[in-house]
Amino acid sequence: MPIYEFASEEIRPLNKTTFGLVQLKERTDLQRLLRVNISVVAPDTLVIAEEFGDWDESRRRIDILGIDRDANLVVIELKRTEDGGHMELQAIRYAAMVSTMTFDQAADVFARFLARIGKPHTDARAELLDFLGWDEPDEDAFAQDVRIVLASAEFSRELTTSVLWLIERGIDIRCVRLQPYSLDSRVLVDVQQIIPLPEMAEYQIRVTEKKR
């Protein structure tokens, strides 16, 4: 569905563009902007690391690692491409690799991230507890699940088929489309969660709760 500009005398469709054409790079632009505005693709999420890669025998890095209000870890992978590449496969690996993270490890990772972005005196542990609404750490409740958010300009049929298959098997994974438009000298981005559709996600939650 196109996006339109309502002008004084007419309604004009905006011109679709690509992140490449408007010279927005994946890491230095898209990732940097979303890191400080993470609610655009992952509401109620606290970013605790960027380019996270604290594991042995692997040079892989998670674009953005966060935590949600339910103390679930959130792996966020970004692509500016028109098909999403193989980002779902990368994200599954990352989710498995961080699934054993403890609260203390997360607090340490968060502290290093805060120092890197110019907030070395912020108490990472206290801020993490405050975000979760906890008085003290609860390791039994921490990181009981890992959610995956894939954000890309577009997604291939292969990728969306894989994501739907994973959802059917209980994996919390979603696709958020970032479609850029050009308007004069500005770049506008239409952000839409396309899988699962928000209405379907709410329905699935209700069905799951009913089964319990």
What are these regions (language model features)?
Residues 1-212:
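Charged, terminal alpha-helix-loop-beta segments
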